[in-house]
Amino acid sequence: MDQYSILGRIGEGAHGIVFKAKHIETGETVALKKVALRRLEDGIPNQALREIKALQEIEDNQYVVKLKDVFPHGTGFVLVFEYMLSDLSEVIRNSQRPLTASQVKSYMMMLLKGVAFCHENSIMHRDLKPANLLISSTGHLKIADFGLARLFSNEGDRLYSHQVATRWYRAPELLYGARKYDEGVDLWAVGCIFGELLNNSPLFPGENDIEQLCCVLRVLGTPNQKVWPEITELPDYNKITFKENPPIPLEEIVPDTSPQAVDLLKKFLVYPSKQRISARQALLHPYFFTDPLPAHHSELPIPQRGGKHSRQRMQPPHEFTVDRPLHESVVDPSLIQKHAMSCS
């Protein structure tokens, strides 16, 4: 930590506190994510390891936040990221007026390029939401927070946790307890983000898992085997029943938007995961090639971070004093690299 000067605190999450800092020698501004270990014998948290592994796999992409360095510090370690000014949730929340059609197209294009790159590198993010889409001082959007990311294969026989993704952006198969799923969970989240950009408010703001499922069913209609053949195979399918409910036309859910936008939204928000449009296919949709065209990044709003950060605040396991010098770490640097490459 001696090579960095701490400029302030950005926020905190389940496994770390994030600080704005400046590299003393180069003057570069970065974000430092300090991950503390609850107990040394527990080892490095899986979410932190997944974040390191995912970003190592992706390497350098202009639509994914860059991991610059990882080093041990005290009873934990520090991830060094490029510094980003704000996030998309701040853009939505602080907009004095709804985003223009061209601004929405620009954000969606950057998001889809990042998601396409992740999926083409066999990485599911599993927690796409506006707060995890960071915005630079030049208006560029980059995907961040890979703590729930996993490598996937097309064989489809691997089991994953269904307790992933923030509730409002959680795919219906996850709400029904699916343990076998694919990158379609990210594509559902992209659709939810798209709808939120169009409406300036969340599409499915459920307060608990059951209400979340009700929000989805209210719009898309009650699923059956005709529209979703795999639904009866989902673990929680028989645990709760819903009355028959016809779908509401998406034109009524996102009024005052173009037919092309509604058509693309429909292609994300479908029950069968395999039927959701891929990120790469979505980039070729007529929506992006009809007027108004996507805005230049210089035309996008650049919000300042507010006093309260939009990420969920959680109590850190140990207090971390940035001013206290720690010349030796109890975490072996080689273990970070070793575990990161083996974690999946």
Swiss-Prot record:
Positions with a binding annotation for ATP: I10, G11, E12, G13, A14, H15, G16, I17, V18, K33
Record-annotated Protein kinase domain positions: 4-288
Catalyzed chemical reaction(s): L-seryl-[protein] + ATP = O-phospho-L-seryl-[protein] + ADP + H(+); L-threonyl-[protein] + ATP = O-phospho-L-threonyl-[protein] + ADP + H(+)
CDD domains with a match to the protein in the record: STKc_CCRK
Subcellular location: Nucleus; Cytoplasm; Cell projection, Cilium
Pfam family, one: Pkinase
Any GO MF annotation of the entry: cyclin-dependent protein serine/threonine kinase activity
Active site per database record: D127
Coiled coil regions in record: none
GO biological process, one term: cell division
UniProt-listed Enzyme Commission number(s): 2.7.11.22
Knockout consequences: Fish lacking cdk20 are viable during embryogenesis and early larval stages, but exhibit curvature of the body axis and curled cilia in distal kidney tubules.
InterPro entries: CDK (IPR050108), CDK20-like_STKc (IPR048002), Kinase-like_dom_sf (IPR011009), Prot_kinase_dom (IPR000719), Protein_kinase_ATP_BS (IPR017441), Ser/Thr_kinase_AS (IPR008271)
One CC-aspect GO term: cytoplasm
Main location: nucleus
Swiss-Prot/TrEMBL keywords: ATP-binding, Cell cycle, Cell division, Cell projection, Cilium, Cytoplasm, Developmental protein, Kinase, Nucleotide-binding, Nucleus, Serine/threonine-protein kinase, Transferase
Function: Involved in cell growth. Activates cdk2, a kinase involved in the control of the cell cycle, by phosphorylating residue 'Thr-160'. Required for high-level Shh responses in the developing neural tube. Together with tbc1d32, controls the structure of the primary cilium by coordinating assembly of the ciliary membrane and axoneme, allowing gli2 to be properly activated in response to SHH signaling.
Subunit field text: Monomer. Interacts with tbc1d32.
Family: Belongs to the protein kinase superfamily. CMGC Ser/Thr protein kinase family. CDC2/CDKX subfamily.
Name under which the protein is recorded: Cyclin-dependent kinase 20
